[in-house]
């Protein structure tokens, strides 16, 4: 990220553009981009065109920007995320192709869903998936790792529960979003807060717990409402029509459920508990899956050969290349925005928002998460803007940490976000199908929770302990 930013900063402005006009162009380009992707436009093409429009409208030299800043952003993103993505996606492919995901789904069905019927049965499936996302998030699974390993499980649960796919991405991401905001979890929002604010992962825990409780309450109310609504409309499992590759209906477990959870348990213990390198642990998990799931990964002939493994792993490699393109496009757009001459003015406005300083700080962290291209970078930007003046404004470091944990999650899940695209494409959905549920469980509920958290921090500073 630093390399991309530094190379961009060295690019001279081609011509002067009034600050107000440049900011209008940036905001308009972003809004049109979000709408286009929501309506089904290719996000790589849309982000590239938006970057060009921003260059023209803000005075950045378009040739230098598109030939230097944008490729450098792609390279930086690949350097940071490629191996992690590759291992996550291959592991998810192994779970789906072997039937291990089906085994985990059946285990969950026996333990949680039981013999319930009708709408109650469907509701239990959805609430169970929300809980799975929350538990795995608390366990240290970040969004991408959870998406690529748990979506196959979710698809099998959705088929068994006769639920439409449109609800799955929002349900899983709702649980993960709650975990990201929860004090004490080993996720980026908490870990990076230690670096930027010098606080503990449990900073301002009481407001944080209240905020997460509000998020989950909104999620549950929404799930109860939407499942009944879909049931009345007669909406059912629609994966077969969309070409989602699934084991045949009614197929018995090809992989023992206990064996199926071993790779996930391995990741939890080694990454979350022991703090080992994620890529190395994922690679070992892939080897474990290849060995433990061998009864499920079979070629057409009775004899097990390496060709089937090659097909599954090859499909994972192809999906990785596609996802890196989506992620790189979003990151490149963020780098273009950050390096416009109007960006410093835009961020400077945050400190001038009238009223309680916590309001301006919340807005800065929320918008920073989008413009900087990630929630972590958004938290870094908010701390850089408000850190030097926090004491004079009466803002404490623990409060900044906890508010930022909620705020950066709000606009980090807009339609052009890599995790949102990954979750949507993994379910073979269009953005307009999946995003209404995602917006409710990761944007609207988090916004409400953040407002409550900011109010608690401002009204009861004694609750904001580091």
Predicted regions and their residues:
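Transmembrane alpha-helix interface/packing and boundary motifs in multi-pass membrane proteins
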Residues: 33-40, 92-93, 132-141, 173-181, ...
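Membrane-interfacial loop-to-helix junctions in multi-pass transporters
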Residues: 19-23, 75-82, 109-129, 158-168, ...
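Re-entrant/interfacial helical elements at transmembrane boundaries that shape
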Residues: 89-90, 103-107, 144-157, 186-197, ...
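Membrane-core helix-loop-helix motifs of multi-pass transport proteins
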Residues: 155-254, 419-457, 463-466
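Core transmembrane alpha-helical segments of multi-pass membrane transporters/permeases
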Residues: 45, 69-103, 279, 287, ...
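Long, contiguous bundles of hydrophobic transmembrane helices that form the permeation core
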Residues: 2-26, 30, 206-312, 440, ...
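Hydrophobic mid-bilayer segments of alpha-helices in multi-pass membrane transport proteins
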Residues: 22-34, 40-62, 81-89, 171, ...
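Hydrophobic alpha-helical transmembrane segments of multi-pass integral membrane proteins
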Residues: 84-88, 114-155, 328, 353-393, ...
């Amino acid at each position: 990220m630093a390399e991309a930013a530094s190379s961009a900063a060295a690019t001279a402005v081609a011509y002067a553009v009034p600050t107000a006009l440049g900011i209008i162009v940036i905001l308009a380009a972003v809004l049109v981009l979000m709408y286009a992707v929501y309506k089904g436009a290719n996000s790589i093409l849309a982000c590239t065109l938006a970057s060009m429009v921003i260059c023209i409208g803000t005075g950045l030299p378009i040739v230098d920007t598109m030939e230097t800043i944008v490729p450098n952003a792609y390279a930086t993103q690949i350097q940071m995320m490629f191996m992690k993505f590759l291992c996550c996606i291959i592991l998810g492919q192994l779970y789906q192709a072997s039937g291990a995901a089906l085994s985990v789904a059946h285990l969950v069905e026996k333990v949680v869903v039981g013999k319930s019927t009708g709408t109650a049965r469907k509701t239990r499936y959805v609430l169970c998936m929300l809980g799975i996302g929350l538990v795995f998030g608390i366990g240290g699974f970040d969004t991408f790792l959870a998406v690529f390993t748990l979506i196959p499980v979710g698809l099998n649960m959705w088929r068994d529960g006769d639920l439409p796919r449109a609800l799955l991405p929002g349900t899983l991401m709702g649980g993960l979003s709650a975990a990201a905001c929860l004090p004490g979890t080993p996720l980026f929002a908490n870990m990076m807060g230690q670096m930027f604010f010098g606080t503990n992962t449990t900073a301002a825990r009481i407001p944080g717990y209240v905020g997460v409780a509000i998020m989950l309450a909104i999620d549950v109310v929404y799930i109860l409402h939407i499942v009944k609504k879909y049931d009345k409309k007669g909406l059912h499992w629609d994966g077969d029509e969309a070409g989602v590759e699934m084991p045949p209906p009614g197929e018995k477990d090809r992989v023992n459920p206990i064996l199926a959870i071993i790779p996930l348990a391995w990741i939890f213990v080694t990454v979350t508990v022991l703090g080992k390198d994620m890529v190395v642990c994922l690679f070992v998990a892939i080897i474990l899956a290849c060995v433990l799931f061998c009864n499920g990964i079979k070629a057409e002939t009775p004899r097990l050969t390496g060709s089937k493994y090659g097909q599954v792993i090859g499909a994972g490699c192809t999906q990785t290349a596609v996802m890196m393109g989506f992620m790189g496009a979003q990151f490149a757009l963020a780098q273009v925005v950050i390096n416009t001459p109007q960006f410093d003015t835009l961020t400077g406005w945050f400190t001038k928002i009238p009223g309680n300083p916590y309001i301006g700080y919340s807005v800065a962290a929320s918008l920073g998460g989008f413009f900087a291209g990630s929630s972590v970078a958004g938290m870094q930007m908010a701390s850089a803007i408000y850190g030097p003046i926090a004491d004079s404004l009466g803002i404490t470091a623990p409060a900044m940490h906890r508010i930022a944990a909620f705020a950066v999650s709000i606009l980090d899940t807009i339609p052009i976000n890599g995790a949102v695209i990954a979750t949507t494409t993994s379910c073979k959905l269009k953005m307009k199908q999946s995003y209404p549920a995602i917006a409710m469980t990761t944007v609207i509920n988090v916004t409400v929770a953040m407002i409550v958290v900011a109010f608690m921090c401002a009204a009861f500073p004694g609750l904001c302990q580091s």
